[in-house]
């Protein structure tokens, strides 16, 4: 049996994949353990593997978690493009709603308004002509398994409760400044260097206390398009804006001080706590029982060595 990822946020989907892929061997294993060793836990697990309802339920969960884990990996990445990460999050949120919400109603909502969408009256039923999308694997197994219609509908209701709770939990975790984060797309190098690009005024006006001269910001924003930037700086958005920030005119003065300061300030917004979790994980490795009396400075020094 393949080992699971030690990282806790990756283990759940992999656990479901292993259970489903090794269903029959695991079922046989626990049956033998229950009969030969008279193990109560093995008997409980064997009873769970005997029930096709559990397998049907896990097939639905696997379908749902694939997209969730994909986006979660993006947030765990240290090199994610912050201008696209909010779009990925909302795309995942919409894909979850597409499973259970009427598509005609959902299509009328723009991406930035998805967090405020009240869809409670547009939830699809589990039976009928237009139903919740339970997935191909779920439907195939439902047709071939020995469950009756009532049992299958019971599983479908469980799946419906799961997806609605997942949508609710994701909604509670969406950032309050979602519209501001969506605006960060305009700072992508491809948009910045385009002759036909989005105006900087809507986002700049929100930070007028820090950047009062909107006209100067707009002039710098338009002038960036006429500079031939080196191809090396297009590899990522941080490299690009670092290059813009260092660009000088003939007298050695920075040519884009305001727009680069605005862009770098917004691009430094935290979008994930993954780096903090990594530090705490490293601290747990460093701060063992033998090192329990280490002072804070010593722990900091060891962490800095590990993080280099």
Spans of model-derived segments:
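Alpha-helical structural modules in large enzymes and assemblies
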Residues: 1-308
């Amino acid at each position: 049996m393949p080992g699971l990822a030690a990282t806790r946020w990756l283990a759940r989907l992999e656990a479901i994949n292993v259970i489903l892929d090794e269903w029959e061997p695991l079922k046989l294993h626990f049956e033998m353990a229950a009969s030969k060793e008279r193990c109560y836990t093995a008997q409980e697990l064997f009873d769970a593997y005997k029930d096709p309802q559990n397998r049907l339920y896990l097939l639905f969960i696997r379908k749902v978690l694939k997209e969730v884990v994909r986006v979660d990996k993006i947030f765990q990445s240290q090199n994610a493009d912050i201008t696209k990460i909010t779009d990925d999050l909302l795309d995942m949120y919409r894909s979850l709603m597409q499973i259970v919400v009427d598509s005609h109603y959902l299509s009328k909502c723009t991406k930035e308004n998805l967090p405020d969408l009240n869809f409670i009256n547009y939830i699809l039923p589990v039976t009928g002509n237009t139903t919740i999308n339970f997935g191909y694997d779920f439907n195939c197994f439902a047709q071939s398994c020995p469950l009756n219609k009532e049992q299958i509908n019971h599983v479908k209701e469980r799946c419906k409760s799961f997806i609605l709770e997942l949508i609710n939990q994701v909604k509670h975790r969406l950032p309050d400044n979602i519209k501001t984060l969506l605006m960060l797309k305009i700072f992508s190098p491809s948009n910045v260097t385009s002759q036909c690009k989005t105006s900087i005024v809507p986002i700049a006006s929100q930070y007028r206390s820090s950047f009062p001269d909107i006209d100067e910001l707009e002039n710098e924003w338009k002038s960036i398009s006429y500079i031939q930037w080196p191809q090396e700086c297009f590899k990522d958005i941080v490299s690009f804006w670092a290059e813009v920030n260092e660009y000088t005119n003939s007298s050695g003065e920075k040519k884009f001080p305001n727009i680069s300061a605005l862009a770098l300030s917004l691009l430094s917004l935290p979008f994930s706590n993954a780096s903090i979790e990594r530090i705490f994980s490293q601290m747990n490795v460093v701060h063992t029982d033998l090192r329990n009396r280490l002072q804070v400075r010593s722990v900091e020094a060891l962490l800095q060595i590990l993080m280099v």
